[in-house]
Amino acid sequence: MHPIVIIGSGMAGYTLAREFRKLNPEQALVMISADDAVNYAKPTLSNALAGNKAPEQIPLGDAAKMSAQLSMDILSDTVVTAIDPDQHELTLEHNGQTRQQVYSKLILAVGANPIRLAIGGDASDDIHVVNSLIDYRAFRERLAERDDKRVVILGAGLIGCEFANDLQHTGHHVTVIDLSARPLGRL
């Protein structure tokens, strides 16, 4: 039987694999991730600064550890470029090489992408989106390089407010901008 394939190595993908393994330890599983497939709790990103957690302290396990723990193949840094549902086949690209991957069942656990605003100007290089551990690492590096402790957060939803609180606790002066009349307007 062909493997069950999970596209995405975020919280949903790893939780699905973990829960499925409890029910079926034998079925072949393959996880495909466009990034390094490091397992971490994404909510940690919005409060790690105040907790003095370096990016290296956040992961719960790298791809090799998770592969062994969940008895599944993990294809990291691999992009799905096509899905053929009739043939139950994926086209994958890794390091410029293309290959096919068959599946019995396919699960899309790709998460969400943040809205990236088209903002220009001489400070546009200082705009960071923090949606992954890789993004968080780059954000922390940029904060460490700057003498200026001012930070502007676009979005006063739960994550934006958590980031604002986290940054304030670490000595940053934070301004939160949102279209809503008040913070947490959608809750």
Spans of model-derived segments:
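Generic detector of well-ordered alpha-helical packing
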Residues: 110, 161-163, 179
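Residue-level detector of alpha-helix initiation sites
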Residues: 11, 36, 112-114, 134, ...
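FAD-binding core/adjacent interface of flavoenzyme oxidoreductases
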Residues: 1-5, 60, 64-154, 184
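Short, conserved structural micro-motifs that define repeat-unit consensus positions
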Residues: 154-161
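Phosphate- and divalent-cation-binding pockets in alpha/beta enzyme and binding domains
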Residues: 15, 116, 138, 162-163
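Beta1-alpha1 glycine-rich phosphate/pyrophosphate-binding loop at the start
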Residues: 2-72, 165-187
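Acidic active-site catalytic centers that drive phospho-/nucleotidyl reactions
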Residues: 8, 84, 162
